[in-house]
């Protein structure tokens, strides 16, 4: 062999063998919990001791929430004279109250409610609108928005159509994009509520003062991060079709909505999981709502009868767990009760007829060692 020849080293044959480490070979030390009466029974009693009182506390807290609901779906059929609201349209929760009276009338597109607050409602006081039979949780509905547009980007029609979620409400017949586009924005709840005027009686015409309620701060802080002021100018965009009442002459440089500060819009865009839901409309966090007769004017815009739905105005206080929620307290109490009852039953069974259950000495691979 010449010196110029290159000596080739033999290649080592590679084997597809896994690493011999304990982790790869699954031979790490392990411990498995063995269920015996002496481990299960304390756990059941502990769960019962924790969950049952917790559920009872939640139930009691919900009982202390003061709440008034008035279904005003049929208000526009009443006429311009005050008439009594049917008792079936009123729901309430007050400690020592068995009856609450309310009156209503309509004029034009305004529904006027005059109702009784029988007990003081301590601040904060919240006003919610409640819709029934409205399915915001439909997938086609919940995804019908362009998040880049809501974050302030001036999206073109081509970009909206390529994204596809706003279909069929990306643009009008002239090719101008809707702002904001999509079904969920187009169906924005647009009833508006006034603050409360206090009166001496249902027949009185002289108000005693104003109980101010505001929309400021009603949206969640994390929702505000999802919206920015738009970079569109008024000539580039048009309002969604169902916003014609709010913007009869379209957008101008002075009236383009700033969705980053529009709490009602942000609240509506957070889709509800169930067909019956409540969303915050107004609040007062500083002043208690004193007992008396109050009046609220509601601009009646949002249709509900077409899909056999209803709409309700609801006034409520809060508790340590939020608003009224009996289900959560009952659920915790039932789980705690079942755990405690199971513990008692198993304890009696073990005392009356004990069995060699869960004892590791009686496992097949341990029997030889014990003998």
Curated annotation (Swiss-Prot):
Q: Which residues are glycosylated?
A: 99, 190, 212, 216, 233, 284, 297
InterPro entries, A to Z: CDC50/LEM3_fam
Span-the-membrane segments of this chain are 40-60, 326-346
**Which ranges make up the Extracellular topological domains here?**
61-325
Q: How does it sit in the membrane?
A: Multi-pass membrane protein
Choose any GO biological process term that the UniProt entry carries and state it. phospholipid translocation
**Which pairs of positions does the record mark as disulfide bonds?**
75-111, 166-181
Q: Which keywords appear in this protein's UniProt record, sorted alphabetically?
A: Disulfide bond, Endoplasmic reticulum, Glycoprotein, Membrane, Transmembrane, Transmembrane helix
- Gene Ontology CC terms: endoplasmic reticulum; endoplasmic reticulum membrane; Golgi apparatus; phospholipid-translocating ATPase complex; plasma membrane
Localization recorded for this chain is: Endoplasmic reticulum membrane
Instruction: State whether keyword Ribonucleoprotein applies.
Output: no
Any phenotype upon disruption?
Abolishes invasive growth during nitrogen starvation.
Q: Which domain of life does this protein belong to?
A: Eukaryota
Q: From the UniProt record, which GO molecular function terms apply?
A: ATP hydrolysis activity
Which ranges make up the Cytoplasmic topological domains here? 1-39, 347-371
Q: What does this protein do?
A: Accessory component of a P4-ATPase flippase complex which catalyzes the hydrolysis of ATP coupled to the transport of aminophospholipids from the lumenal to the cytosolic leaflet of membranes and ensures the maintenance of asymmetric distribution of phospholipids.
Q: Which family does it belong to?
A: Belongs to the CDC50/LEM3 family.
Spell out the protein name for this chain.
Phospholipid-transporting ATPase accessory subunit ivn1
């Amino acid at each position: 062999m010449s010196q110029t020849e290159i000596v080739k080293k033999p290649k080592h044959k590679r084997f597809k063998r896994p690493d011999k480490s304990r982790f790869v070979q699954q031979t790490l030390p392990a411990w498995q919990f063995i269920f015996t009466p002496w481990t299960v029974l304390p756990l059941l009693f502990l769960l019962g001791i924790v969950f049952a009182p917790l559920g009872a506390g939640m139930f009691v807290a919900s009982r202390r929430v003061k709440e008034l609901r008035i279904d005003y779906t049929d208000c526009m059929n009443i006429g311009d004279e005050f008439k009594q609201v049917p008792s079936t349209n009123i729901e309430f929760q007050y400690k020592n109250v068995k009856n609450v009276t309310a009156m209503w009338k309509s004029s034009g597109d305004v529904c006027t409610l005059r109702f009784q607050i029988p007990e003081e409602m301590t601040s904060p006081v919240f006003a919610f609108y409640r819709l029934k039979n409205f399915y915001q949780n439909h997938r086609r509905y919940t995804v019908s928005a362009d998040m880049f547009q809501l974050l302030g980007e001036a999206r073109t029609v081509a970009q909206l159509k390529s994204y596809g979620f706003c279909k069929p409400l990306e643009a009008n017949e002239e090719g101008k994009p809707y702002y904001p586009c999509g079904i969920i924005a187009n169906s924005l709840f647009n009833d508006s509520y006034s603050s409360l005027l206090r009166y001496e009686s249902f027949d009185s015409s002289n108000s005693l003062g104003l109980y101010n309620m505001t929309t400021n701060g009603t949206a969640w802080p994390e929702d505000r991060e999802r919206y920015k002021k738009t970079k569109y100018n008024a000539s580039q965009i048009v309002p969604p079709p169902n916003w014609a009442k709010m913007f009869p002459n379209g957008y101008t440089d002075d009236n383009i909505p700033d969705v980053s500060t529009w709490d009602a819009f942000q609240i509506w865009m957070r889709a509800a999981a169930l067909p019956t839901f409540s969303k915050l409309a107004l609040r007062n966090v500083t002043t208690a709502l004193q007992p008396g007769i109050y009046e609220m004017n509601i601009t009646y815009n949002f249709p509900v009868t077409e899909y056999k739905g209803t709409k309700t105005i609801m006034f409520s206080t809060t508790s340590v767990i939020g608003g009224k929620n009996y289900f959560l307290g009952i659920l915790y109490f039932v789980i705690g009760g079942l755990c405690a009852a199971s513990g008692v039953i198993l304890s009696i069974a073990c005392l009356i007829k004990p069995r060699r259950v869960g004892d590791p000495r009686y496992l097949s691979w341990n029997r030889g060692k014990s003998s």
